[in-house]
From Swiss-Prot:
RNA-dependent RNA polymerase, which replicates the viral genome composed of 2 RNA segments, RNA1 and RNA2. Does not need an exogenous primer. Also possesses a terminal nucleotidyl transferase (TNTase) activity. The TNTase catalyzes the addition of nucleotide to the 3'-end of plus- and minus-stranded RNAs, probably to repair the 3'-end nucleotide loss. Forms the open necked connection to the cytosol of the virus-induced replication vesicles. Mediates viral RNA1 recruitment. For RdRP activity. The viral bipartite genome is composed of RNA1 and RNA2. Residues 882-891 have a biased composition (Basic and acidic residues). It is found in: Host mitochondrion outer membrane. One of its GO terms (cellular component) is membrane. It comes from Pariacoto virus (PaV). InterPro entries: DNA/RNA_pol_sf, Noda_Vmethyltr_dom, RNA-dir_pol_C, RNA-dir_pol_PSvirus. Residues 96-264 are annotated as: Capping. One of its GO terms (biological process) is DNA-templated transcription. This is RNA-directed RNA polymerase. Keywords: Host membrane, Host mitochondrion, Host mitochondrion outer membrane, Membrane, Nucleotide-binding, Nucleotidyltransferase, RNA-directed RNA polymerase, Transferase, Viral RNA replication. The N-terminus is important for both membrane association and mitochondrial localization. It may also contain a RNA methyltransferase (MTase-GTase) capping domain. The C-terminus contains the RNA-dependent RNA polymerase domain and a structurally disordered region at the very end. It holds the Pfam family RdRP_1.
Amino acid sequence: MEEHIPLPSQYESPKALPPRVPSSRWLRSLRPRLANSCLALKIRAHESLVKIRLCKPYDAQSRSKIIEKVIERRETRKTLAHQLKDLKLVPVARDHTHGRAAKFRTSANIWMNEAMRAAGYEPYNVSMSNHDIERGNRYFYFAKDLTIPYRNDPVSDNTGFVFCDVDYYADMEKWMQHFKPMLLYTLVPESLSYHCDDHSFHVNDDRVFFDVRGGASYSHQLWDYTGDTICVRGKNKELLVFTIEQKCIQGDPHRRIIFLEPAARVAWPFYKPMKVEVGLKRKCMTAGQVNVLYEPIDDKISLSASGSRHTVETTGRTLAAITARMKNKTSPPMVADVERILRDAGDKEACVNAPILFELIPEAKFRVNVVKTTATPTHFQPLGPLRTEDGETCGHAVTTTLATAPALLPMRGVNSDVATVNGRVKKPANTVIPFKEYKEYASEFVEFLVPEPGVGHPWDTAAVREVQDNRQQKARINMVAATVSTHSSNRLKAFIKAEAYAATNDPRNITTMAPELTLMMSCFTYAFKEKILYEQPWYGPGKTPKQVGRRLQSIAKHGTLESDYSRFDGSISEWLQKNVVKAAYMRFFKEHQRTEFQSWFSKVFMQMGTTTAGVRYEAGWGTRSGSPITTDGNTMLNAFVVYCCYRKLCHTPAEAWRKLSQGALLTGDDAVLAHENGLEPALLDVVKNLGLKVEAKVNGPDDPVSFCGRIYPRLSDCITSFQDPLRTIPKLHLTTNKGVSPEQAAANRAHGYLATDKATPIIGTWARRVIELTGDLKVKGATREEQYKLSNAHQQLDPSLIETAMANILGIDVGELKALDKAVSEAKALDQMPVVLGNCYKHKIEAVVGGEVVGPGPRVETVEPNHEQSSGTPEVVPEMAGHSERRDKSSNPRPGGKAEGLSSKAGKPRVPTRPAADRKAAAGSGNRRGPTNGRRPIRDRAPRGGGRPNPGTTPPVSNSETTTTTAVVHASA
């Protein structure tokens, strides 16, 4: 029986009490406590002194030495980690509604309990199921929990906790305060959504929504077990450190076995100076309106929109590339930008993922189109394999359009590249091997062209550098100057040429060469050009505008024949390249230099090429538009065709060469020939035999002549010329110069046209007015085309002749032309240019223009809406060019040219006139005119022949958002 020791009375002396001797065990436990308390007091005192700056904080060594005295470590891993072997699946009932999920869950539960027992611990199942036989607890959270009895077993010193798919609902920090080993079977998603046979889940707002077939739906947050350690505070504020070990489960990629091992315990406040992140946090998977899940080891990222069950999986590197692309685009970002990068990254579902990902990139939502001058469509997007592609713009408008059907620029992208390859490379590809006689013609032509064989010597690279003196050429040469050799390789890289088209068409491609090849092969081509081609009277490149005019004058004395080839570059055959172009160069150079040229030539015509969008294609034998032999090769081939024509007319070789030398001017695929009987059918026959396509037009001695986009109205008197207005006016407002401001780009373009067409109505006036409206800006950052115009001014000595010829082309009177010209000169701003040309589209391919799909098809006559000024009062300009009602049969024929609506026969006007009945009906519709101020309104006119629509044309694109200073008023047809 325990002896009762009465407490001493307050009146009794303490000395009278028998002394109580502490046990040795208690003293041993008290000693470290006292030591720790003293050490803690010392640390707190030191902290106080640090605050008042009487001493310095502990350095890392001193702090670590103090912590080592009080730290408590566990060696749990050595016993438990070795039990974590592969998970073996146990069978479940065949009729289980979600057998797969149940199999993994049950197998994991059994496996974790066995691992705990094998390591010597007593398993403690948190939120235990009805199958668990070990110790544990069971509380009620959901209605389903009520089917199993309540349970709350005590935690012993030898407990090991087991969490089987329940840690989401548990207060894990409180359980970790027990400082016991933990095994968890939990959801660690690798993507934001998952679907399988019996269950699925998706993430939204940092919560997982889990659906089980034949079962319930759950939603919960996840704990973030990222990293290698987790720290929590114990009940006495001590620091509890757990290490994390994760084991992936084969067959269930979104589930893991996680081992939380108690590793170290440090009392308060010894760990206070350490930089320790304390607490277990919930997994964060939502940023704003986007759900994001990133796995840094595999660089996998999963994204979805808030509230969406559908995700996009890609790599972090790919997403970074897409984001950078969006940030640095000068034009509005497009879905195709994303799709293109995904395709290149190997995403087989790029077409589906691109639109979803595009909406998830924040940068894509804040970019807008910077073109402010007009809402008129400026680009067309060919229909192609990328259904969601929007393409990249290659230019923009600097003023409002002057035409009802403005010219269009091609978008850049996969669809445009495919259209280019199909329309400019594959479709016109020429495999024709002509008759034997053409082999003889080729030999004769080459011998006349290069009379002395083996005398040529290539330039050195220094001479090439002096000639190629523009900034881009210099940069290209400097880039390879140190590494170039005679054995350099080549690569074909094609890109879409930034040029405007009268309607949708297969974009032209420029096939660039490796800089090394361009430099080394130019040594040969410049030498050949200097010694051979410049000596030929028919060779047009390099001639000044005055020399071109004089040459045309000498040719046109008895009439001319103009030829217009179709897809000339793409239709050149291997036979033509080898028997004409290559043969001429090889004959010119010395024998020991021919091997090198042949090597460069073969590299130019390597057969595989790649577009800028990554489209691979077989390049065939068509002219490489970016090679050193492009212009010279095409001009020689053009000359060879003409030589064959004269041989077909039974001229001797010498006579054929003489006629070519005396009666032709050729530049690339442009040709003007002195006319003679039988020449036109001979041309058509030769072209057919060589596998080419051409349209020919015969002009009389006094007829206008068109060459390289310029019209020479009366060569019998003067060499005055002007730009073809039907080609030029629709594209005046467009520029491809993105390196300068819109105002500077407009000024550059205007200065170029002012140099070539200062006396041309509308065109020259537009240029002068733009320069005035831009504050007389000087040329800065001009394109190569603009620089060429500035340095090649054409003679315009007879302005009245230009007015008469241009009015005839446009189908209006000179007085009406002057009125249109005046309207342009009175434009109040760049975005208030008047519409002066009534043209229409003749689309050649299906494409998207202004959000609508257009393409070849019958023309439908429409009445365009009025475009009112900001004041609300429509201004009616004079009769719009191309809409005349007063052309009669006695009118002078319009000058030649290659624009739409031009006749292919000499002596006939090319602008169709309106039938008398239609003119009479239109004259009676005075109620449609509005205020005219004595000037006639602009009317849409019917084509010749009873007003029936022209097949193959479509109406002008009408855009109600276009800002103009004039109202286009149409009378009923």
